[in-house]
C-alpha cells in the first residue's frame, strides 16, 4: 500500500482549492527554473531511469518515447497531451484536469523543454466542459505569473500551451486520429509509419502523451528517479491512479503503488465488493477495452502491466469495473459491443463491418436465440478483426468478447439451451 508521503496527487479529491496560490502550497511550480537549467538530456534520462510507462493504456516507456524526437530539425516540434478520456470505466484524467491542473501545466512545460517543443496542445474531451474551464483558468494564471509563455519561469525558454476542445468522438483518443482532429480534419487514425515523432502534427515532429504521464513528471524530477523506481515492482514502477466502479460499496479514484493486489485495492479503498468478496463474479481490470477476469483469477491478480498480461488481461487505463453475481455478464459485454460499434470511425472494413456484426450476435446470445455453433463463429470473427485494423479499436472491440467466451462459455451455452 502506498505511503501517504509518496502520493503525487495530494489534491486528487478536490479537498483544497486548485488555484495557483494553493497549488504552490502543495509543491507545484517549486523552483521549476532549476529543473529546466539542468538541461534536456538530464530530464529525459531521469524519466527513463524512473521507469515511467505511459499511463494511457499502452505502457510504453515515456523517456524512450521522448528520445525518439529528432535532436536537430528544421521544422518546429510539438507536444500534444491526450486529455480525450472517453474509455468506459475510466475517469482518472478528469480528476487531474479538475483538481490538479497546475501539475499538468508544469509537466507540459518540462516535457516540451525536454523534446524541444515551443508549442504544446492539450486536446480535451468535448464533454469535459468544467474541466476545460479549470485548465483554461490555470493557464491564464500561469501566463500572468510568467510561468509559461515567453521566458518561461525566467529560464530563457519560450513555451506556449493551448487548450483545444474535442467534439466527443471516442476514436480521437487514438493518437493519430487526435492529430487529424487537431488539424481540423475528420478524426480518423493514420497509417504508421510514418510515426508522429517524425511526421506528426502539421507534418512536424510530435510527441503525444497521456495526462497522467505528463502530470507526474515534475514530481519525479524533484524527488528523483530512484524514488519513483523504488515504488511498485521492477518494470512496473511508480504510482498509478485507479478508478474503481461497479458493484463496490464506495466507488472511487485512488492513487496507489503499481503492483498492488486487485483484491486489496478493492477492499481497502472501495469498501469491498457489494455483498462481500464471495459475491464477486468478474472484474474488468483496465477499462472496457481489456478482457475480463473471473473471480478465481481476481484472487491472485496484481495491478500492473506484466501481472495482468500473464493473467490474460491488461492494465489498460486502470479502470476497475467490478461485477457481482447479480450481473447479466453476457448483456454487460454486449453493451460494450454496442459502444465500439457506435464509436468505430468506419475507415477499416474489419472494424466497420465486424463491430456491428459482433453486437448483433451478442444480442442474440443475450436473448438465447443463437445456435451453439455461433459461439465459435463469434470467437473466430474476433480473431479476424484483432490485429487487422489501422488502430487498436478493432482489438478493443474483440477482447471483451474473447474474455467472455473464454471464462463464461458455460453460461452462454446454458442460456441458448
Swiss-Prot record:
Keywords: 4Fe-4S, Flavoprotein, FMN, Iron, Iron-sulfur, Metal-binding, NAD, Quinone, Translocase. [4Fe-4S] cluster binds at residues 345, 348, 351, 391. It catalyses: a quinone + NADH + 5 H(+)(in) = a quinol + NAD(+) + 4 H(+)(out). It comes from the Bacteria. Its EC number is 7.1.1.-. Belongs to the complex I 51 kDa subunit family. GO terms for molecular function: 4 iron, 4 sulfur cluster binding; FMN binding; metal ion binding; NAD binding; NADH dehydrogenase (ubiquinone) activity; quinone binding. Coiled coil: none annotated. NDH-1 shuttles electrons from NADH, via FMN and iron-sulfur (Fe-S) centers, to quinones in the respiratory chain. Couples the redox reaction to proton translocation (for every two electrons transferred, four hydrogen ions are translocated across the cytoplasmic membrane), and thus conserves the redox energy in a proton gradient. InterPro entries: ComplexI_51kDa_subunit, NADH-UbQ_OxRdtase_51kDa_CS, NADH-UbQ_OxRdtase_suF, Nuo51_FMN-bd, Nuo51_FMN-bd_sf, Nuop51_4Fe4S-bd, Nuop51_4Fe4S-bd_sf, SLBB_dom. The lineage of its organism: Bacteria, Pseudomonadati, Pseudomonadota, Alphaproteobacteria, Rickettsiales. SMART domains: NADH_4Fe-4S. Its cofactor is FMN; [4Fe-4S] cluster. It holds the Pfam family Complex1_51K. This is NADH-quinone oxidoreductase subunit F. The keyword Transit peptide does not apply. NAD(+) binds at residues 54-63. FMN binds at residues 166-213. The keyword NAD applies.
